[in-house]
């Protein structure tokens, strides 16, 4: 399982790199660097095997953005984007009969390295874009919460109540889409949605472990703001 996940992770890294390298060989060259910040909310769950009855756990995200734009190939504006984010994720177990639940929040530092393709205006106006690439994460802390009359002994699976994560390192794949509005002297304003699929299990998935699968997945909504540190002197950029 671990070797298969690493192969998938390496494949996405390679495809993202090759895609940007190929586009950088031809097209309308530019060299622009922007820096900014973003923040928003996450709706997260965990892919458990054996499965648990889950709802979505809401968390927060915030971080910094570094973006290098290198090329416009045909109509696609090609860039590399690296981020450092604080990210809350985890899961929430729910009951049908009541609003009682158990939740575990896991706080990570996440570092996505993304290929970014955009279509539209770069300096003044709107553009749509997509991002795709690998992401790694490092667990900082975790906490859990019970509400109402939640009773551990009444659950089929109870391992997760008394055990923290076995592994602090996480990796997976991120895919997103958004809109950006740019204005001269003001910068770039973004709104974006993303999906993260974790390839790594945070509980021991060996024959000695309880869960065969315990990988994160998250839907993220965020807004961001960037300013240009340097721009290309290219008359074709609009």
PLM segments and residue spans:
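Gram-negative (and chloroplast) outer-membrane scaffold detector with strong preference
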Residues: 67-148
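Residues on the lipid-exposed face of transmembrane beta-strands in outer-membrane beta-barrel proteins
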Residues: 37-41, 62-70, 86, 113-117, ...
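Residues that define the transmembrane beta-barrel architecture of outer-membrane proteins
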Residues: 31-33, 56-62, 105-111, 126, ...
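Outer-membrane beta-barrel proteins
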Residues: 24-26, 45, 67-72, 116-121, ...
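Predominantly the C-terminal beta-signal and adjacent terminal strand-loop region
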Residues: 30, 77, 89, 170, ...
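Short glycine/proline- and aromatic-enriched beta-strand/turn motifs that initiate or cap beta-hairpins
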Residues: 25-67, 226-228, 238
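Hydrophobic h-region of N-terminal signal peptides that target proteins for export
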Residues: 15-23
């Amino acid at each position: 399982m671990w070797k298969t996940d690493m192969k998938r992770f390496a494949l996405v890294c390679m495809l993202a790199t090759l895609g940007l390298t190929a586009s950088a060989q031809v097209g309308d060259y530019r060299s622009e660097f922007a820096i900014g910040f973003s923040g928003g909310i996450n709706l997260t769950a965990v892919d458990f095997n054996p499965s648990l009855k889950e709802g979505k756990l809401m968390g927060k995200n915030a971080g910094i953005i570094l973006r290098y734009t290198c090329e416009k190939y045909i109509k696609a504006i090609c860039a590399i984007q690296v981020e450092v984010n604080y990210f809350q994720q985890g899961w929430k177990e729910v009951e049908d009969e009541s609003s009682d639940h158990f939740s575990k929040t896991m706080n990570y530092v996440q570092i996505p390295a993304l290929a970014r393709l955009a279509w539209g205006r770069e300096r003044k106006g709107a553009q749509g874009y997509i991002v795709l690439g690998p992401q790694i994460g490092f667990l900082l802390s975790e906490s859990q919460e019970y509400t109402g009359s939640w009773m551990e002994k009444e659950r089929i699976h109870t391992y997760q109540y008394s055990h923290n994560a076995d592994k602090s390192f996480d990796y997976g794949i991120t895919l997103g889409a958004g809109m950006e509005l740019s204005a001269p002297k003001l910068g770039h304003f973004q709104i974006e949605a993303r999906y993260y699929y974790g390839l790594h299990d945070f509980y021991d998935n060996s024959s000695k472990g309880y869960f065969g699968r315990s990988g994160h997945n998250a839907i993220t909504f965020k807004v961001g703001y960037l300013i240009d540190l340097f721009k290309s002197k290219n008359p074709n950029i609009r």
